[in-house]
């Protein structure tokens, strides 16, 4: 499910470690901000990353921000539960992050229709 929250596009999702079966949140979903400038799959807060993926060896990656600054992320491959779809991709975190952020790698499987006049959002799978 997707929404506009204060004119910000968000999607409802849950994150799962495919190796341990741990899911966050345990019940329900969280809002993740849609960021079309982020080319990755999913950014999550550090405490959630530790809760779900602490047993796995993480990989470091460099992220380049729009202003040219560079950040180092760490991540692992995980799953996103989005409605009835299960999507696999690189789930990462950066220091100080306190929200969930979806990127192009996750969104490329969907058609997104946003109508700010009607305050409506439709998210539909490509297939």
In which residue ranges do the predicted regions lie?
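Pepsin/retropepsin-fold aspartyl endopeptidases
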Residues: 1-127
């Amino acid at each position: 499910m997707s929404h506009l929250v204060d004119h910000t596009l968000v999607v409802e999702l849950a994150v799962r470690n495919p190796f341990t079966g741990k899911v966050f949140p345990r019940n329900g979903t969280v809002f993740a901000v849609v960021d079309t400038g982020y080319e990755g799959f999913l950014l999550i807060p550090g405490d959630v990353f530790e809760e779900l993926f602490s047993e796995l060896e993480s990989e470091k990656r460099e992220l380049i921000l729009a202003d040219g600054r560079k950040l180092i992320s760490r991540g692992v491959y995980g799953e996103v539960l989005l409605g009835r779809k299960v999507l696999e991709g690189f789930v990462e975190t950066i220091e100080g992050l306190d929200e969930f952020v979806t990127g192009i790698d996750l969104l490329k499987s969907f058609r997104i229709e946003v109508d700010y006049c009607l305050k409506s959002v439709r998210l539909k799978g490509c297939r």
